C-alpha cells in the first residue's frame, strides 16, 4: 500500500515521523505517541495509545517503525479517497443539490444508467436507505447504505 505514495508524500511523512520519534531512535513508542497526541490537544489513555500502536505494529515489537508508519498513513489516505468518492456519488444523485436524494432523483439517475425500475422498486430502495423515515435519503443515510455492503 505504501508503494502508491509519491516521493514528496514519503518525505512529508518522514518529517511527521521525526516529530513523533522524540529520541530519534527510529521507532515511535506509546510514550512518544502520547506526547504528540497531547500536544495536539488529545488526551488518550495508555490503553488507547497501545491500541493505536498495535493497529499498525505489524512485527509485534510494541513500537512503530517508519515502514509501519507509512503503511498507516497510506491506509488513512485510502480511506479519505473512498469518502470523497462517496461524496461525489451523492452529488450525482442529488440533482437539485438540496442535500437529499428524492425518489424522482433516484429514478432519473437509475434510468440514465440503463436501469428500468418500477416506482415500487425505487420506493423500496429509498425505504431501505431512509433510516429517519422522511421519505428521502440524506448524506449520512447514503454513506450508511454505501458502506454497509
From Swiss-Prot:
The reply to whether Ion transport figures as a keyword in the UniProt entry is no
Q: Which domain of life is it from?
A: Eukaryota
The terms describing its cellular component in GO are: myosin II complex
Q: Where does Ca(2+) 4 bind?
A: 130, 132, 134, 136, 141
Repeat among the record's keywords? yes
Q: Where does Ca(2+) 1 bind?
A: 21, 23, 25, 27, 32
Q: List modified residues, type N6,N6,N6-trimethyllysine.
A: 116
- Recorded protein name is Calmodulin
